Amino acid sequence: MMALLRRILTWPKRRWRAGGFGIHSPFAFAFVTQVLAKRNIDGNEAELRAIAGRNYRQYALLYRCVKYFKPQSVVIYPTDDATLTRVINLAEPESRIIADGETAIPDMTIITSDEGTERDNGAAVYFISRADKEPRGSFKARMASECERGMDFSDYRTWIMCRFKHLPRQSFKIVLK
């Protein structure tokens, strides 16, 4: 009885000290700690809050992803979303937003609407918000099943797929902040 009580009382301290050591891949650990678990955005918070409005948390996560991956070219859906464009330019001014029909394969694809869920454009990184809604949910499932290498990170609303050839195929279900 005493051992059970001791385990119950020391559980919060053990949980606090665990600190994410269950993630063994260096890429996954760095991505989770520097992008997904981080709350601040290093200096541009006021400007991002002015751009994002009510959707600050989602756009802050997107900002951190763009800042982390530093994509040269980005495809966004919907293509005329001024807020997405401003967030990308704030995070990485050197990124070029391209149309989906261009021959170049984008480094990153961001989907926040039902546009763009018809086909895979070959991007190394996919960021899909509201992935729990159709047709984005079925697109996410199709992408995950067809991908042989890479990692995906998701919670109940957002899905981030990193398709890099050097990564093993793994899925992480975590709370995105």
Q: Where in this protein do the model-derived segments appear?
A:
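Short beta-strand/loop segment that forms part of the nucleotide-sugar
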Residues: 126-129
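A short alpha-helical cap/connector motif
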Residues: 1-110, 114-122, 132-177
